[in-house]
A protein has these predicted regions:
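Charged, often glycine-enriched C-terminal and inter-domain segments
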Residues: 2-30, 65-68, 75-247
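Non-catalytic, surface-exposed connector residues within folded enzymatic/regulatory domains
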Residues: 35-38, 61, 123
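Single-stranded RNA-binding surfaces
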Residues: 27-43, 52
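Intrinsically disordered, low-complexity, compositionally biased regions/tails
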Residues: 50-52, 76
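Short linker/helix segments within small regulatory modules
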Residues: 55-62
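Short connector loops/turns at beta-strand edges and beta->alpha or beta->beta junctions
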Residues: 46-49, 159
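Residues immediately within or flanking Cys/His clusters that coordinate Zn2+
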Residues: 38-41, 47, 64-67, 73
């Protein structure tokens, strides 16, 4: 007889998912009490099943049903230690180490064999611990499969002059250089800076979405500055094919 499975949730950061992690979790498991003994079930003679014979129009039919006395284990309690329940079991606190591979997905279930509840009886085997993965939302990175997305906001001046910016990745901060004249909506692809593939080699990419931030309020001098730009040929939009959004 196999013991029942236990189910828990483990919350992981995007960095832990990207790099893989070992987690120690505390669980309450049913275990056989120390000193407990079992003997063969007298109802089923240790088979765990009750054979029934019925007369039908086709002749005598034999069927097997689970023994109600031992619940199919073939054994019943002989010596019950103090504190144990009617099946000789105790509820015990246990710490389980779980190795979580890189690239797991929110909602995925991992199995830790033999770390579930034990079952009564000398020939029983413990159930499994089922671990459900729960991904913690990242402050600045959004996951899409193995790729990651990052929204980078820059000013008009930074877009016109070019700028070096520090951005978040799952392996730490990196600095990227934006060329002068970069357009809002431009997507920069950082190869291999995404999430590792769980079942194959390689990593996804990090897609940096460039957004030119427009100020909502301007003082008098700033308004005059931008009004001059309205008639400047260099500030009249002349989008090239590579600048246009793909919609």
């Amino acid at each position: 007889v196999k013991g029942s499975n236990l189910r828990i949730k483990v919350k992981l950061t995007l960095e832990e998912i990207a790099n893989g992690v070992e987690k120690k979790v505390k669980v309450k498991r049913k275990v056989q009490a120390s000193g407990v003994t079992y003997r063969s079930c007298p109802t089923c003679n240790g088979s765990g099943q009750i054979m029934k014979v019925a007369n039908t129009i086709l002749g005598r039919m034999q069927t097997a049903t689970t023994c109600h006395t031992c619940s199919g284990s073939g054994q019943i309690l002989d010596q019950k230690p103090a504190g144990a329940d009617a099946q000789g079991m105790l509820l015990e606190d246990d710490t389980v180490s779980i190795k979580i591979p890189a690239g797991v997905v929110d909602g995925m279930q991992l199995k830790v064999a033999g770390k579930g509840n034990e079952a009564p009886g000398t020939n029983s085997i413990p159930g499994d611990l089922i671990v459900a993965i729960e991904e913690i939302e990242h402050e600045s990175l959004k996951r899409e499969g193995e790729n990651l997305h990052y929204d980078l906001y820059i000013s008009f001046a930074e877009a016109a002059l070019g700028v070096s910016k520090e951005i978040d990745t799952v392996s730490g901060k990196v600095r990227i250089k934006l060329e002068e004249g970069i357009q809002s909506g431009k997507i920069l692809r950082l190869k291999g800076k995404g999430i590792p593939s769980l079942n194959s080699y390689g990593n996804g990419d990090l897609l940096v979405h460039v957004n030119v931030w427009t100020p909502k309020t301007l003082n008098k001098e700033q308004k005059q500055f931008f009004e001059k730009m309205l008639t400047d040929e260099n500030f009249i939009p002349k989008p090239e094919k590579s600048d246009k959004s793909f919609f």
